[in-house]
Design a protein with these regions (language model features):
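Residue-level "micro-hotspots" composed of small/polar
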Residues: 19-41, 47, 69-82, 120-125, ...
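Residue-level detector of Asp-centered blade-edge/turn motifs that repeat once per structural unit
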Residues: 41-44, 86-89, 134-137, 174-177, ...
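Loop/turn residues immediately N-terminal
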Residues: 53-56, 98-101, 146-149, 185-189, ...
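Solenoidal tandem-repeat scaffolds enriched in leucines and small polar residues
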Residues: 130-132, 141-149, 164-173, 180-187, ...
Length: 741
């Protein structure tokens, strides 16, 4: 019998991404229920959530739900879904108030019932367990007012000891292998568990504390016990001086739900109603850290935190009853500017087609419902030409271009509505026809896609039919026949203009009016945006052809698209720059930073918290204060130009679901080729007749999961790399006997 030896080699295609402070996970993302009670991270890196419906596993992209089965009956009531722990050996445990203990069986990818309280204990008592806990000795505690049921997960033996405390246990913190702090509904106790006997150790300072304890946290380095209560604030027991202190945390009117380490010197305190607080373990300085901001669309979205998990710079929160909220401390936040229904002190419409900053630093937004002006000094909004403005006579409210033609005078180019002139000082808008500057009959434009002011002070207007140069001060106008379908206009130098159109790129001589068509190495010639860097390179954002960089001196192009770089869209809508250190590109599903010196791309998508991610053509500006603002179909976003992402990122590739003849096989099962889990298998040996099989590949990544692509090859069978794909299911049918790598 010949044996088949397989090795799989995978290549990883990815892009670094900008993320945002908060990310929200709900049922629409795959979470089984918005009511989340506990969060853990498993040894492989999966995040595990205990919800009202059961247990969910999350890899950054996909959720998988697990059923808890007892004698072929699913136990999914709230009484069976209470605590989730990871043991010292990395095993995942679930404990319910009904007294059932489930262990995660990694080999078979399921939860297995390993112990439950005797029927006589459960009968007549819907919640026989007041608290479930697993200690560092891998002993599961099922705490009852009359007895403690201790299940040894190593020997699988159960021991029942009398509960000498005589109170309902609410929390346990382990000090060392034999000593514990035990919180109850009336106080805190110091106890020793030795030879299966629980003895209370008298402690005057603790025994005199009379309060309902919700949460205990023992800071081993400082030997301090932090005691979270129900509406009585936060207390501290210092084992070094044997004293109890009431801490001035200002949490007397809320319930403290969880206390965990944040770093070596700080702890985080979660509450049911006041968000998360941060406290220094030495000075006891306590400040609000994560608190709901209901005035922002992209900030913390709730204050009832049932549990949280500190995962490096990322904090996962069970935000009851909303779902999971993830805060990432690596990244700066951004401002999301949106329309608020019925509120005139907001953006007039969320479809933002153009943005400019005027000479006074105020912001103008062209939308599908008129123009919005935001005063940066007074923080006030004012709208023009919208359906909300009284006395407005225009029937068309869609505007797609803006330009400050002289201080305080704004031109707004419309869609089938010509140009309107807004006098900022007088707060008046009126229809304006630049053709009145000329004696010739100039055909009205269907739309005005681009209006800009060149270095000589001339105004350029580009529309469906015409390209016009307008001397606003002298009231002269000049047309350039032969150029139409204008999409963007920028100045090359004092003598030339770059003209982007629906049919390609042109270089125009201002004086002579002659223009040169620039042949581009792409099939789709529609240009969305142009930007010229200080070194003369022209960046061209196209529709469905990616990014072109044109070197005019050498008459050469550099072409970037989805198939040859980490760009995740070939539709480049807006191009802005931070003094050429980086080039910012907006697309229909991301923002992308391109770094010319390194020729690398970094993407920022909805997965990383970018709430508004479908951007509009030529809609953006770099402000004088160093902030970028970009317009989208869902408002505008503003962030500082220096906001960057770390270049160190983590992912873990997972091999799973080995199927032979279309049936999943597990280690140790009869006929299975696996001795250990497929993810831990180095050499896969198959019998000659096991030549129809498949294998699934996935990754654990919480920053950019949708940007991961997989490619594979099997030397000796398929020597070339497969086409990169987002999902990777490798199938083999009738593979010939032999050795493959």
């Amino acid at each position: 019998m010949r044996k088949l030896v397989l090795f799989f080699i995978f290549t990883y295609f990815s892009a670094l991404c900008i993320a945002q402070t908060y990310k929200y996970l709900g049922v629409e993302d795959g979470l089984s229920n918005r009511r989340v009670y506990a969060i853990q991270k498993g040894p492989k890196g999966y995040m595990w959530f205990l919800t009202h419906n059961g247990i969910d596993r999350y890899d950054g992209k996909n959720f998988k739900q697990y059923r808890l089965i007892d004698s072929e009956i699913e136990v999914n009531s709230m009484l069976n879904l209470s605590w989730l722990y990871v043991g010292t050996d990395g095993t995942l445990w679930e404990i319910g108030k009904k007294g059932r203990v489930f262990r995660y069986d990694a080999k078979h990818d399921r939860f297995q019932l390993v112990y439950k309280l005797p029927d006589e204990v459960v009968k007549g008592n819907p919640t026989p367990v007041s608290y479930g806990f697993i200690d560092s000795n891998n002993i599961v505690w099922l705490c009852n007012e009359e007895a403690l049921y201790l299940y040894d997960t190593n020997s699988e033996k159960n021991t029942v000891i009398e509960n000498h405390i005589g109170e309902s246990i609410t929390d346990i913190e382990q000090i060392d292998p034999e000593h514990y702090f035990i919180g109850t509904d009336v106080g805190v106790h110091h106890a020793e568990l030795k030879d299966n006997v629980l003895n209370l150790s008298p402690c005057h300072w603790l025994d005199n504390l009379k309060m309902q304890v919700n949460e205990l946290y023992f800071h081993k380095e400082s030997r301090k016990l932090f005691i979270g209560t129900f509406q009585k604030g936060l207390y501290l027991y210092d084992m070094n001086i044997h004293q109890t202190i009431k801490l001035n945390a200002g949490l007397e009117d809320v319930s403290i739900t969880r206390i965990k380490a944040f770093n070596d010197k700080e702890i985080l305190i979660a509450t049911d109603g006041a968000g998360v607080y941060k406290m220094n373990v030495d000075t006891y300085k306590c400040d609000p850290y994560i608190v709901a901001d209901y005035n922002s669309y992209n900030a913390m979205n709730g204050n009832s935190i049932y549990d949280f998990y500190v995962d490096g710079d990322r904090i996962w929160m069970a935000n009851y009853p909303i779902g999971i909220t993830v805060r990432n401390n690596q990244y700066a936040s951004y401002q999301w500017i949106k329309h608020s229904i019925g509120n005139k002190q907001s953006l007039v419409n969320d479809q933002v087609n153009a943005i400019i900053e005027d000479h006074e630093g105020d912001l103008w937004f062209a939308t599908n419902n008129g123009i919005s002006l935001y005063s940066t000094q007074t923080k006030q909004w004012h709208s023009f030409l919208s359906v909300f403005d009284s006395g407005n006579v225009t029937k068309n409210h869609v505007f797609i271009s803006l330009c400050e033609v002289s201080p305080g005078i704004i031109w707004a180019g419309g869609y089938s509505s010509g140009i309107y002139q807004i006098n900022k000082k007088q707060m008046k808008a009126e229809f304006f026809t630049p053709s009145t500057f000329s004696d010739s009959d100039i055909r009205p434009d269907k739309y005005i896609r681009s209006i800009m002011k060149d270095s000589a002070g001339n105004i350029w207007s580009g529309g469906y039919y015409n390209l016009k140069q307008i001397d606003f001060s002298r009231k002269n106008i000049r047309t350039y026949p032969g150029l139409n379908g204008i999409t963007d206009i920028i100045e090359k130098d004092e003598k030339h203009m770059w003209i982007g159109t629906a049919t390609g790129l042109y270089l125009l001589d201002k004086e002579s009016g002659e223009f040169q068509y620039i042949s581009m190495p792409i099939e789709s010639f529609y240009i969305n945006a142009l930007y010229q860097s200080d070194n003369g390179l022209l960046y061209i954002g196209t529709s469905n052809s990616g990014l072109l960089i044109y070197d005019y001196e050498n008459k050469s192009f550099e072409h970037f698209h989805k198939d040859n770089c980490p760009l995740i869209s070939n539709n480049i809508y807006t191009i802005l720059s931070d003094e050429d250190q980086s080039i910012l590109l907006s697309t229909e599903n991301s923002l992308t930073s391109y770094y010319p010196s390194e020729k690398v791309f970094h993407n920022w998508t909805k997965e990383q918290g970018l709430k508004s991610d479908h951007f509009n053509s030529a809609s953006g500006v770099l402000r004088k204060n160093g902030n970028f603002i970009l317009g989208s179909t869902d408002g505008a976003i503003e962030f500082h130009k220096d906001m960057m992402i770390p270049r160190n990122y983590k992912f873990q590739m997972i091999f799973s679901d080995l199927r032979v003849f279309y049936q999943t096989v597990y280690p140790g099962d009869e006929g299975s080729p696996l001795e250990v889990d497929i993810d831990e298998t180095k050499v896969l040996k198959l019998k000659y007749n096991q030549n129809i099989f498949s294998l699934r590949i996935s990754s654990i990544n919480y920053d950019y999961p949708s940007l991961i692509l997989y490619s594979w090859k099997l030397e000796g069978f398929y020597d070339g790399w497969s086409r990169p794909e987002k999902d990777c299911l490798i199938r083999f049918t009738n593979l010939s006997p032999g050795k493959y790598t």
